[in-house]
Amino acid sequence: MRTRGSRNWRSRASSGSGTRSWSIEATDRNLSQQCDVAEHVRQRVKLYPAQTVKRAFRTNPVSVSLRSKSGMHSTFGMLIRRESLLQRMAESTGQGVGRDELATLKLLALDGALDESTKVSCADLAERLDASNQTASRRLQRLEDAGLLARDIVSDGQEVELTGDGERRLQSEYADYRRIFESDASVDLTGVVTSGMGEGRHYITLPGYMEQFIERLGYEPFAGTLNLELTAESVRKRARMSAIEPVTIEGWEDDERTYGPAYCYPASIEGSDSEYEPAHVIAPERTHHGEEQLEVIAPEKLREVLELADGDEVIVHVSE
């Protein structure tokens, strides 16, 4: 039973041995949201002996008291951040997305769910995953809760399709494997030239950034960026850039504000008639641009050197 306002929870449960009964009181003075800690403890005690429960909560921000019928009790004070408890509770209630869920996502993509809605049944999926129907169903639910999968329950199964986030998650996994098996990771991105808002000119010329550009990139960039709108295919491929080691431009601050870091990926720019390098794809940590927007810096004004106008298509070769 939960007492409103006090954030104290009580529950009764078997210790797991069948011979002892425990009264459980869990007090949490730090959580900013209502988490049913007692239920979490109760489930743990039902499955495991008391010492196992004690170990399970050793890194949680709660005070848990297990009291036997004879009146003997022990209390453990937990002082770690609340995120630890939230993470454990999420794992125990099936909210996390781990390697098993990613394996399921990959299997669905291989079935065609990357490009269109695909019908699946939990029984068939469970057999292919070597898991129970309940486990397969839980994995689908976790993927949906995480925004990686869209589901529609129909009379004879489920229609599933990877979301944009789901596709990017697999692209990121793919990029990791490329780093393992390929010595020189690379990705080609296609986009059309667009006009920016002029923000690139302002930020590039700030001393805190410009000094690092010169030192770490080996050139003084032109005061402005080449803005590109990527094709749908290149938006999907963009996650592969995580396999490439960027040049980090550190964040800094002045008397008025702080400025976030940026990451520069070595690149060359291919226009209709010529190719230009050196250049860098710049990815500020703080940006209002979406995944479809790409910014490129170079020592010269790329529009003039490559004779580009809005709407022209270019290919950005990003590599280490």
UniProtKB/Swiss-Prot annotation:
Source species: Haloarcula marismortui (strain ATCC 43049 / DSM 3752 / JCM 8966 / VKM B-1809)
GO biological process: FMN biosynthetic process; riboflavin biosynthetic process
Ranges where the record places region Disordered: 1-25
Cofactor: how and how many bound: Binds 1 Mg(2+) ion per subunit.
Family in the record: Belongs to the archaeal riboflavin kinase family.
General function of this protein: Catalyzes the CTP-dependent phosphorylation of riboflavin (vitamin B2) to form flavin mononucleotide (FMN).
One Pfam family it belongs to: CTP-dep_RFKase
PANTHER family reported for this sequence: RIBOFLAVIN KINASE
Enzyme class: transferase
The protein, known as: Riboflavin kinase
Any one Gene Ontology molecular-function term assigned to this protein's record: metal ion binding
Region of interest (Riboflavin kinase), residue spans: 187-320
UniProt region (H-T-H motif-like), positions on chain: 1-186
Protein residues bound to CDP: 196-201, 300-303
Binding site for FMN: 287, 295
Binding locations of Mg(2+): 225, 227
Pathway info: Cofactor biosynthesis; FMN biosynthesis; FMN from riboflavin (CTP route): step 1/1
Catalytic activity: riboflavin + CTP = CDP + FMN + H(+)
